[in-house]
């Protein structure tokens, strides 16, 4: 019996899957404790009628990993991050887009099309023509968690944090900025004094916005917002 159907049928399905998975290169209290991923799948079905009416079906699936966590050789307070950052820094940098640049501060963020909760933000502050200070953070539910850079008490890092806080206050709708460090650090007292001087406050361990961790000190910089406040350039 001849086949009445001569044209091939093509069916295509595309969908995006987002989520996070544990990044064991960083401790659980770090903003980079999880990989953020965004997979794009495309499944194509081709149906072709052969002389005896048998079906030939082909499936094609494409997977695109579009987002991974940042690891920076210059910036990470984690020793593992310092060791591993060199090999991944360039690849991760390519996944960030410039969001803002003025004076010595440049802000990078994940692709706006991939924005989800949380969102990755990087703050680069130029100190000289060849050096810069970096603060890497995750924006989650109007809270910004900053990773403390290596040698956080250096004058350059303090200047860069001031510029970062000014940007966050003026250009975003963030309500609180968090930093954290180990309770048993040798420079714990110096960190407490330095961040307190800049307006940070120690957060109680049972604060609902924090993970239930031991031996970790969280400090928060609260931003007082006026009613009806709208950021001029939201991330």
Curated annotation (Swiss-Prot):
Tissue expression remark: Testis specific.
GO molecular function: ankyrin repeat binding; ornithine decarboxylase inhibitor activity
Keywords: Cytoplasm, Nucleus, Phosphoprotein, Polyamine biosynthesis
GO cellular component, as recorded: blood microparticle; cytoplasm; cytosol; nucleoplasm; nucleus; sperm flagellum
Residue list for modification Phosphoserine: 9, 12
Subunit structure: Interacts with ODC1 and thereby sterically blocks ODC homodimerization. Interacts with AZIN2; this interaction disrupts the interaction between the antizyme and ODC1. Interacts with GGN.
Family recorded in the similarity comment: Belongs to the ODC antizyme family.
Stated name of the protein: Ornithine decarboxylase antizyme 3
